[in-house]
Amino acid sequence: MRPFVHFFIPELIYLKRLIKDARKIIEPELEFRMAERPDVVKPQDSLSWLDDVRAGRPFDVVSGQLFLTVAAIHTTSVVITALMYDLVKNPEYIHLLREEAIKVYREDKEWNKTSLYKLKLLGSCMKESQRLNILGPIPTFHMRDPEIFGADSDQFDGHRFLRMRQRPGEENRWQFVSTSPEFLSFGHGLHACPGRFFASNEIKIAMIQLLLNYEWKVLDKPPQSRFASRFVPDPETLIAYKSRTPEIEF
């Protein structure tokens, strides 16, 4: 039935229209780049990377670009949303994270990779939120295994991974970007997410902006996932915000 029914499903019709719109934008750019112009430097972007990978073989670059967009933007935005949910439910961490960001910035006078690495409480909160709010469709019990994460493994503890990193020999094992058989949010081994280092810095920068420039609070019901098996933000959840004067200018 699917080869025939999919033509009439509203959601699929809408998706096909979006793909068609994407082709109108991307394909002319691909044709422009394929024209031989020795004086033009090849752009360093995802379209160029996809073109390098296909190496002349048949490959739908538009579909590849759309896949990368979903993989890079959707996952990052969901992780940020989940962390915001956890912080409004545990507001004591909002003040602590602001203090950490202010301290690091005043020491380094700028934001760079080293200063972002110093935001260890923020990294711990990010990993704790990722542990409790699983993005994959397959539930993983070991992410809440009390033998690994403690008797309170069902509760949000923003200091959990900060403490675990203080154990001898485990300083790097429990960073946000670290993978292991006990923590599979980014996969593990050869197939671990290659973009997790960029995503970590991206999330930290976004959270610094949100923490220092805004106050948040829940308007109605406590924020939660739409599904128990994996984290999907509830679109009916309302988080109110208002501007605040940041303690530092950046």
Where is each model-derived feature located?
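Cytochrome P450 catalytic core segment centered on helix I
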Residues: M1-A55
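Conserved cytochrome P450 K-helix E-x-x-R motif and the immediately C-terminal K′/meander segment
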Residues: D108-I148, R173-F176, S180
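Active-site rim elements
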Residues: K113-L116, H188-R196
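Central I-helix of cytochrome P450 enzymes
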Residues: L47-E100, S129, G195, I203
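Conserved cytochrome P450 K-helix/beta-meander segment immediately N-terminal to the heme-binding cysteine loop
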Residues: R144-R173
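Active-site-adjacent bridging/hinge elements
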Residues: M1-R2, L50-F59, E171-L184
